Amino acid sequence: MAASMCDVFSFCVGVAGRARVSVEVRFVSSAKGKGLFATQLIRKGETIFVERPLVAAQFLWNALYRYRACDHCLRALEKAEENAQRLTGKPGQVLPHPELCTVRKDLHQNCPHCQVMYCSAECRLAATEQYHQVLCPGPSQDDPLHPLNKLQEAWRSIHYPPETASIMLMARMVATVKQAKDKDRWIRLFSQFCNKTANEEEEIVHKLLGDKFKGQLELLRRLFTEALYEEAVSQWFTPDGFRSLFALVGTNGQGIGTSSLSQWVHACDTLELKPQDREQLDAFIDQLYKDIEAATGEFLNCEGSGLFVLQSCCNHSCVPNAETSFPENNFLLHVTALEDIKPGEEICISYLDCCQRERSRHSRHKILRENYLFVCSCPKCLAEADEPNVTSEEEEEEEEEEEGEPEDAELGDEMTDV
């Protein structure tokens, strides 16, 4: 049951009409599936579309470690200065230009029943209307025996940082269908994401859960069923259906990163200052990030993932002509042209980060094959086809380090810094 073209564009915001006239979804091949193509000239730097996800959820360990985000849109809730104080471990850390912080605490609201926090009344209402009535634990928020808490604890015991997925993304899918008046529409939307064979699904689940994935998957399925069973999507609760749902989230979940501190830094970059003042501010920010790295390491953002209908139609290229980002400090995904895109040209993003894209063809293929189960045939890979299938010594060392990390360390789309 495929989603209609109308459904594909229905989660675009702001420039939704623009997206409908500037791009179209086409079938490419049995290997690639769908693709997104320009129908008119798109200029470099132009926003091609802005899209909100069908569902999104913060990663569970990220939330447990006090990365405070709106429970609906993932907007960072800490003031930039509070964020800096927590990440540096310095309660007295003060930021200059506090007026540049965009966080509005006066607008924050919590659920009156379970106390989860939202950035605004609009987000609280949107969550309540879409899925939160089903998922709200009420006064049992901290009860370890509540079915949802048992499910989340089981997930945390299996999927450690760096996180790439969340069982709560799947929970919000079910809860959305449960609450929906038009259940068939939501089932159509979720079913349009790419499907894998049984063997491919097992590879994805293995990547997420590790060597004991079969037993762990069955434990999660049992807890998931106990907490959320819904007759309208009963197939999602069977062993095969749950594995498919898991694989759907593992391959289609787009990483989301938000940070009030990053927003403040970007605002500082736009200030018109005297050269000496600019030098002082830049030096302050450089030192701030050094202090954060020493205290916190690489985990700077509120992190989660979401399912985006139109963005999921964008195929990968190692030389992308578009990129994804989250400049609004929430779950609204912007796809922006990196170069002029001609009518009829496919719009491609990269599933690899900047460093990975600079590695050898062999290394790029290894990452893509392990995480997305395809072999890239973009212009860069075709041009390098005659290169030997070897990695440099530096890349081999990096791969050895990665093999020492949790097996899920690289799964998922690039989390774009804000």
UniProtKB/Swiss-Prot annotation:
<keyword id="KW-0963">Cytoplasm</keyword>
<feature type="region of interest" description="Disordered">
    <location>
        <begin position="385"/>
        <end position="418"/>
    </location>
</feature>
<dbReference type="GO" id="GO:0140943">
    <property type="term" value="F:histone H4K20 trimethyltransferase activity"/>
</dbReference>
<dbReference type="GO" id="GO:2000736">
    <property type="term" value="P:regulation of stem cell differentiation"/>
</dbReference>
<dbReference type="InterPro" id="IPR044422">
    <property type="entry name" value="SMYD5_SET"/>
</dbReference>
<dbReference type="GO" id="GO:0005737">
    <property type="term" value="C:cytoplasm"/>
</dbReference>
<keyword id="KW-0479">Metal-binding</keyword>
<feature type="zinc finger region" description="MYND-type">
    <location>
        <begin position="98"/>
        <end position="136"/>
    </location>
</feature>
<protein>
    <recommendedName>
        <fullName>Protein-lysine N-trimethyltransferase SMYD5</fullName>
        <ecNumber>2.1.1.-</ecNumber>
        <ecNumber>2.1.1.372</ecNumber>
        <ecNumber>2.1.1.359</ecNumber>
    </recommendedName>
</protein>
<keyword id="KW-0832">Ubl conjugation</keyword>
<feature type="binding site">
    <location>
        <position position="351"/>
    </location>
    <ligand>
        <name>S-adenosyl-L-methionine</name>
    </ligand>
</feature>
<dbReference type="GO" id="GO:0016279">
    <property type="term" value="F:protein-lysine N-methyltransferase activity"/>
</dbReference>
<dbReference type="GO" id="GO:2000035">
    <property type="term" value="P:regulation of stem cell division"/>
</dbReference>
<comment type="subunit">
    <text>Interacts with the N-CoR complex. Interacts with EHMT2 and CBX5.</text>
</comment>
<keyword id="KW-0949">S-adenosyl-L-methionine</keyword>
<dbReference type="InterPro" id="IPR046341">
    <property type="entry name" value="SET_dom_sf"/>
</dbReference>
<dbReference type="GO" id="GO:0042799">
    <property type="term" value="F:histone H4K20 methyltransferase activity"/>
</dbReference>
<dbReference type="GO" id="GO:0032259">
    <property type="term" value="P:methylation"/>
</dbReference>
<keyword id="KW-0862">Zinc</keyword>
<comment type="function">
    <text>Protein-lysine N-trimethyltransferase that specifically catalyzes trimethylation of 'Lys-22' of the RPL40/eL40 subunit of the 60S ribosome, thereby promoting translation elongation and protein synthesis. May also act as a histone methyltransferase in the context of histone octamers, but not on nucleosome substrates: trimethylates 'Lys-36' of histone H3 and 'Lys-20' of histone H4 to form H3K36me3 and H4K20me3, respectively. The histone methyltransferase activity, which is independent of its SET domain, is however unsure in vivo.</text>
</comment>
<dbReference type="Pfam" id="PF00856">
    <property type="entry name" value="SET"/>
</dbReference>
<dbReference type="GO" id="GO:0140955">
    <property type="term" value="F:histone H3K36 trimethyltransferase activity"/>
</dbReference>
<feature type="domain" description="SET">
    <location>
        <begin position="21"/>
        <end position="352"/>
    </location>
</feature>
<dbReference type="GO" id="GO:0008270">
    <property type="term" value="F:zinc ion binding"/>
</dbReference>
<dbReference type="GO" id="GO:0045814">
    <property type="term" value="P:negative regulation of gene expression, epigenetic"/>
</dbReference>
<dbReference type="GO" id="GO:1900249">
    <property type="term" value="P:positive regulation of cytoplasmic translational elongation"/>
</dbReference>
<keyword id="KW-0489">Methyltransferase</keyword>
<keyword id="KW-0808">Transferase</keyword>
<keyword id="KW-0863">Zinc-finger</keyword>
<comment type="similarity">
    <text>Belongs to the class V-like SAM-binding methyltransferase superfamily.</text>
</comment>
<dbReference type="GO" id="GO:0141005">
    <property type="term" value="P:transposable element silencing by heterochromatin formation"/>
</dbReference>
<dbReference type="InterPro" id="IPR001214">
    <property type="entry name" value="SET_dom"/>
</dbReference>
